[in-house]
Structure formats: C-alpha cells, structure tokens
Amino acid sequence: EKIDPRQYPYIIENKRLTFVGEGWKSGLWSIMQFDPETHFVLPNTGDNLGWRPYDATEVKPGLVRLADPKREANKRFPAPGTILVLRHSTRDHAGIFIYHSTDTKLENLKLFHTCGLGILSQYSKNIAFNDVHIIPNAAKGRVLSGHDDGFHFMGCSGLLKIENCSWAGLMDDPINIHGTCSRIMEVLSPTRIKCKFMQDMSEGMEWGRPDEMIGFIEHNTMRTVATGKMNKFEALNKAEFIIELSAPLPAGVEAGYVIENLTCTPDAEIRNCHFGSCRARGLLVSTPGKVVIENNIFESSGSAILIAGDANAWYESGAVKDVLIRNNDFRYPCNSSIYQFCEAVISIDPEIPTPEQKYPYHRNIRIVDNTFHLFDYPILFARSVDGLTFSDNTLIRDTIYQPYHYRKEGITLEACKSVVISNNKIEGDVLGRTVKFDRMKSSDIKISKNPFFRKLK
C-alpha cells in the first residue's frame, strides 16, 4: 500500500515526512497500528514512541521508507499487512459544537471523519444522543474516524442520555464527561480572586456564571475544603479571569488552591452502546451527578472505563458520588495497550499527589453483574474511593493474547474504604487472583462468598 498524494499531499523535509495543505504543513508525530482483519488497535502498541528517531526517504511517489538511523530504537516493527494510521496536524475544530443550549437531541447520525473532537458540548443542559455513530467509512476502506474524542462534554448540566451509539477508529476516548478546575493565582480582596486556566485547551472558556456554586480544592489531597457562590465573571485574557464572590473567601483558602464549578455537573445515562477499538480508553466520567453505565459492549484499546479527576495535570474536575456500572460486556482488546491512566480494565485513577484515606475523593461506585473477558491480570484499580462494590460479576479467562501488563494483581486498592468484593463467578484459569492494597487496612476490605480473590498487602 502507498500514500495517495492526491488525498494526502506530502513532502520530505529534513528527512522527516511532512504533510502539506493550503497554507499549512505538519510533520508526522505519531503512528497507530491496526489489525487488517478486525480493525482493532494491535495489542501492546498504543502510544509506542520507539519509531520517532527516523529518517524518511521517498522510494517512489507514494512510497516512503522510514528507517531508524541508529537501528536502536525499534524493538518491534509492524508486521507485513498491518494498517498504519499516520497521525499529523493539530486538533482543529469539532464536527458538531453544542454551546449554551437546552434540550438538545441528536439521532440517526453517522460521522465518518472529524478534524478534532467529534461532538463537543459545553455549558449545555439536557442532551440526548440516540443512534449516533462516529465510525470509519467502511466503503472507502478507512480505519480512522476522528482526530480526538468522540463525545466530549464539559461544564454541562441536567441529564446526558446516550443510547444505541457506537465508536471506532478514534484517536482518543469515545466519551469524556468532566468539568474544569482552575487555579487561584492571587487573592485580590476578600471577595475577588484572580484565577487561571492551567490547561491551554481550556483557554478562552467562560468558566462560570452568576449564582453558580464553587468548590475550593486543596490540590495535593484533592479535598474540597469549602464552597461559595459566584457573583460575577470577568475575563482578563484567554487564560486568566477574575471571579467576584457573593461572600468573603472562606478562611484558609489562598493562592495555589483550585476552584471547581459545582453547578455545571450533569447526571449521565449510557446504555446499549458499542465502544469499539480506538486509541486510548473507552468511557471517561468525572461528575458528581448520578451516573448509570449499563448494557454496553467495550472493546477499547486501553482501559474500558476511567474515573479520574485532578487539579494537577489535565485539570478535569468532577469527584463522583453515585456510579452504577451494570450488565456490561468487557471484551478483548480492553486494556491491551498502555496509555495514561490505564491501570486495569476499569481504572479509578484520580491524580492525587498525597491521597489520604480520611478524605476520599470518589464515593459510591458499584460494579455489578458485568462480564469480563480477561487475558491479563488487572481487572480493577481504585484510588481514594469510599464505598466501592465489585460483586456478582462473571470473570472469564481469554487466551487471545499473552499477559503483558506491569500490574500482576486482579484488584489494586489505594487509600480506599468500605470495599466489598463478593459473589463473583470465575470461568477458566483467570490470572488476577490477588487484591493488593496500600494506605488502608485489611479491615477496610470485605471479601465474601468467593474463594477466588485473596488479600495481599
């Protein structure tokens, strides 16, 4: 196969493959490998950066040779027949943008390609997607459907209802639901604080509106120490803004703390969807609203479900308080490649520099009545959760691929409490038999009606 220079014009510049367009050019910065039969991301490839030290030479028009000049970096080369997606350019614009809207419904849609996020929703209330698919155009033989996330929700409220949807071939997560933390840079007066968007992809947003509630967070422990109400929002530039509070700043809150919008926090229902093989994870959810995830099929390359939240890197806020993960089918290739936060098939992985068990970040997560097809050890990873249930699930050994993950425990717990693991059914020689825990006591874990799992300090 060759690069079609009519569809994808390119040049070789300084021994680098560079794609060109009208008024722009962009060098190759990532390569994804897809199975030619299943169109799954090939296992244990993911964000493999070993190919980056390369020299490009044109063998003939459309045929480019990429060679490691030192013959050192690549320990694994793509097999003949592998489909390569050559990633270049930057996140451009969303295919569909929903902004400051109410009661929006999309249905019976297919998006074959977007140059950025598939559907971006911001500061909108009550959104319903039914029978919406972001998938490659099979008629053209494509495996790529989008540059970034599929459905991306930031700062929304009301109910997000997603049913009968599917995704495949995305270069990021099919669904991401979150808010945005911003840092307090300066206390200007008892009622005025100067804040900053710490992630450049958040810059330019309207962080909040009058009468919306604010949480004040100590970023090392991610503990919400106080709340307040916003009276006025004033943008200074794309990155910085001033918030006027309706009452004096709570005692102890100072520069370096972060703020979270507690009003723009939706409920979410995600049912009967197919999370096909995409780069990275399947479903990311960070909202304190009620969340139901049920009757879905997951075939993600990384973790199927990520529950994160942080004020230290991505600044995506939303400590969960009520999450039900029920009757889903987690299939290969779930967690078959390593990406950020992919600690297990289900990864509850908030970025907390110093997690303290007495200040849990997430609460009330139930993982029940699901089926896991497992070729590797890690099933569940959880940090800083109060009230975690893993019960009545069916765990089935799958030998489609060899174990590779650095974690060798089935369940890993850190700074959690009130954990229940019970009545899980085992089929075959499932590998992850141990429960590893840290920053917590053995008595914080209750294992019953199942001799399979055993505790390991």
Q: Residue ranges of each PLM-predicted region?
A:
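Eukaryotic tandem repeat interaction scaffolds
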Residues: V320-D322, D329-I338, C342-I346, E351, ...
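Extracellular polysaccharide-degrading/modifying enzymes targeting complex plant/algal/animal polysaccharides
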Residues: E1-F112, L120, P136-L144, A168-G169, ...
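Short glycine/acidic-rich loop motifs that flank beta-strands on beta-rich extracellular proteins
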Residues: H93-A94, C115-L120, N137-D149, M171-I177, ...
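Short, recurring structural edge motifs at helix starts
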Residues: D92-G95, D149-H152, Y257-E260, A280-G282, ...
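Solenoid scaffold repeats with emphasis on beta-solenoid/beta-helix
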Residues: I96-Y99, D103-T104, L109, Q122, ...
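Long amphipathic alpha-helical scaffold regions
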Residues: S124-L159, L188-S202, N295-C334, L395-V420, ...
